Amino acid sequence: MSSEQEFEKPVIELRQKIADLRAFAMERDMDLSTEIKKMEARLSELEEEVYANLQPWERVQIARDHERPTTLDYVDVLFEDFLEMHGDRLFGDDKAIVGGIATYKGKPVTVIGHQRGKDTKENIVRYFGSPHPEGYRKALRLMKQAEKFKRPIICFIDTKGAYPGKAAEERGQSEAIARNLLEMAGLKVPTISIVIGEGGSGGALALGVADEIHMLENATYSVISPEGAAAILWKDAGKAKKAAESMRITAPDLYELGIIDSIIPEPRGGAQRNLHQQADEIDRLLEKALTRLAEKPVDVLLDERYEKFMKIGHIPEEAATTGQ
């Protein structure tokens, strides 16, 4: 079961009332189907009201849900014959990033993604989804292998950010991230990145220099967490909600800004409500995107990728002069 957020309380309470009424009807052998149907209709309306008008901070909470599907959850549903590969051939194997080769619709692909845990024990093993340099170097090794064998690359982004510890810095965290940005820009195969949860800072961008970038409806993508931004701007991490509203970190915001290519719909309440329904949405997008990119010559692919990232952050001159 996914964790319950404050804004979901009215929905959760009504669901519980319906469950209680069903149990009461069965226990007393009473026909309360009419009353239950009315309550279910109200529940549907209430879910629409709550989930169709989510605020940025509420989306942050959904993106952080500990039951939200991870990279490996999607790999299990979307791909066949997945063979996980380990190690960066320089230091070790970072379990905060998983990757390997797989089959998608009968064709070979390389799949890479951040991997967080779903409980404390697993999160410790996977560094809470925050990679060390060896994780990014493992990812790059797999990308270069994919380029060699002409396999498309599919990346799943889901991290609060790169691991901030002393050992990670000593082993070249910033260099590893920068190297990935450089190398991904020049990969001669189609690349697709999908933000499935949190997309935090350079730790996310190291898997995000792709031909197409897509986001799940309730995912976030930002240079810093709302708490971090609040601590810097107002010296108070408790103002994270205010920061989230100002940062434009949600999928609708980023689509409007031209940073992402599409928004992938989620089930009501988030991807954690129905893994297979969410995977179906991703599947439809992937099939179309891979077909679209496969038709492009390598030089066109590289030119369009370059132009895509050069446009990010660009403000048209007329907008700048009018203050818009």
Swiss-Prot record:
Record pathway: Lipid metabolism; malonyl-CoA biosynthesis; malonyl-CoA from acetyl-CoA: step 1/1
Substrates-to-products reaction catalysed: N(6)-carboxybiotinyl-L-lysyl-[protein] + acetyl-CoA = N(6)-biotinyl-L-lysyl-[protein] + malonyl-CoA
Domain annotation CoA carboxyltransferase C-terminal: ranges: 42-296
Any single Gene Ontology cellular-component annotation: acetyl-CoA carboxylase complex
Enzyme nomenclature, EC number: 2.1.3.15
Pfam families from the UniProt entry: ACCA (PF03255)
Listed HAMAP family: AcetylCoA_CT_alpha (MF_00823)
Subunit structure: Acetyl-CoA carboxylase is a heterohexamer composed of biotin carboxyl carrier protein (AccB), biotin carboxylase (AccC) and two subunits each of ACCase subunit alpha (AccA) and ACCase subunit beta (AccD).
Family per similarity comment: Belongs to the AccA family.
The protein's name in its UniProt record: Acetyl-coenzyme A carboxylase carboxyl transferase subunit alpha
Lineage, uppermost ranks: Bacteria, Bacillati, Bacillota, Bacilli, Bacillales
Gene from which this protein is expressed: accA
